[in-house]
C-alpha cells in the first residue's frame, strides 16, 4: 500500500464502500511517523503493517517522497468530509502526524517558504552517504518525479504543500483552534505565492516544474498537481495548464 496511491485513490475507495479499509490504511501510515526516520513514515507497507522491502532497509536507508505527508493530510480531510468520522480530526495518532508534519518535518527537510528554494538535493543522510545507493539519494525526494538528478524542489511538491497546509487549517478550524487555522492558511498562501511569482513563465505561458541544485528551472512532469490541489486561482494560468497537459503524453503517475 503506497502513500501516494492510497491518498489519490481513497475517494474512489470511499464511493465503493471501503471507508473502513481507508481508515485502517491511513491509521497505519500516520502511526509510523518517527524522528528516527526524520519525521517520515513508511512509503509503502504490506498487509502486516511492515515496510515493503523494495523501499526500505532500515530507518536510515529507505525510499521516500517528501510530498507524502502533505498528501495524506489533504486526503484525511476529504475522508472526514465524506464520512463525518471525527477520528480524522481528533485521534491522537492523526493529530500527532499532522503536527509533526507541519512543524518538525518541514524544519528537518528545509521546506519552509523562506528556505525551500535554497535547499540541498540530499539531506539527513548517513555518514557513509553513497550517491549510487538509491536508499540514500531517494531518502527524501522533493517530488513524485523520481528520475531527475539534482532536483531540489518539484512543482508538485509546492502544490501538495499548499494542499496539505490548507487541509491543516481547515481541520484546525473544525476543532476550534483559530491560531493553527491562521498558521495553516498563511503558510499555504506563502507556497502559492512562490508558485505564482517564481514558477510561472510568462513568455511561454506555462509553469516550470523542476528547480535544481544549480538554481535553474527545467521542464517535465508535475503540472497536473497544480490543478488537482487548486494551487492556482488564476483562470488564465489554469486554462494554459490544461493546454500544457494535453499537449503531450505523460507517465501515468503524473496524472
Range-by-range predicted roles:
Residues 34, 81-88, 110, 173-177, ...:
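Short, flexible helix-adjacent loops and helix caps
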Residues 37-38, 109-121, 199-204, 231-238:
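Proline-centered turn/helix-capping motifs that create local helix->coil transitions or kinks
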Residues 28, 32, 75, 82, ...:
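Structured segments of extracytoplasmic/periplasmic soluble domains
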Residues 1-77, 81-89, 223-227, 255:
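Substrate-binding groove/exosite segments of carbohydrate-active enzymes
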Residues 77-107:
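Internal, well-ordered domain-core segments that constitute the primary functional module
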Residues 181-199:
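Short amphipathic alpha-helical coiled-coil/interface segments
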Amino acid at each position: 500500500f503506497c502513500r501516494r496511491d492510497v491518498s489519490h485513490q481513497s475517494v474512489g475507495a470511499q464511493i465503493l464502500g471501503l471507508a473502513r479499509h481507508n481508515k485502517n490504511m491511513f491509521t497505519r501510515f500516520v502511526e509510523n511517523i518517527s524522528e528516527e526516520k526524520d519525521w517520515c513514515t513508511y512509503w509503502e507497507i504490506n498487509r502486516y503493517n511492515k515496510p515493503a522491502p523494495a523501499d526500505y532497509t532500515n530507518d536510515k536507508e529507505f525510499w521516500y517522497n517528501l510530498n507524502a505527508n502533505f498528501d495524506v493530510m489533504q486526503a484525511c480531510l476529504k475522508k472526514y468530509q465524506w464520512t463525518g468520522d471525527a477520528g480524522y480530526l481528533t485521534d491522537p495518532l492523526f493529530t500527532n502526524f499532522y503536527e509533526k508534519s507541519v512543524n518538525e518535518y518541514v524544519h528537518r527537510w528545509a521546506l519552509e517558504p523562506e528556505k525551500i528554494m535554497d535547499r540541498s538535493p540530499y539531506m539527513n543522510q548517513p555518514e557513509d552517504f553513497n550517491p549510487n545507493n538509491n536508499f540514500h539519494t531517494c531518502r527524501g525526494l522533493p517530488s513524485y518525479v523520481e528520475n531527475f538528478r539534482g532536483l531540489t524542489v518539484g512543482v508538485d511538491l509546492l502544490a501538495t504543500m499548499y494542499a496539505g497546509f490548507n487541509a491543516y487549517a481547515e481541520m484546525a478550524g473544525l476543532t476550534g483552534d483559530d491560531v493553527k487555522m491562521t498558521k495553516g492558511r498563511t503558510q499555504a498562501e506563502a507556497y502559492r505565492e512562490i508558485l505564482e511569482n517564481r514558477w510561472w513563465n510568462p513568455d511561454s505561458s506555462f509553469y516550470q516544474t523542476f528547480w535544481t541544485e544549480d538554481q535553474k528551472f527545467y521542464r517535465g512532469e508535475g503540472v497536473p498537481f497544480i490543478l488537482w490541489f487548486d494551487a492556482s486561482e488564476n483562470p488564465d494560468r489554469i486554462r494554459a495548464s490544461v493546454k500544457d497537459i494535453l499537449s503531450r503524453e505523460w507517465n501515468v503517475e503524473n496524472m
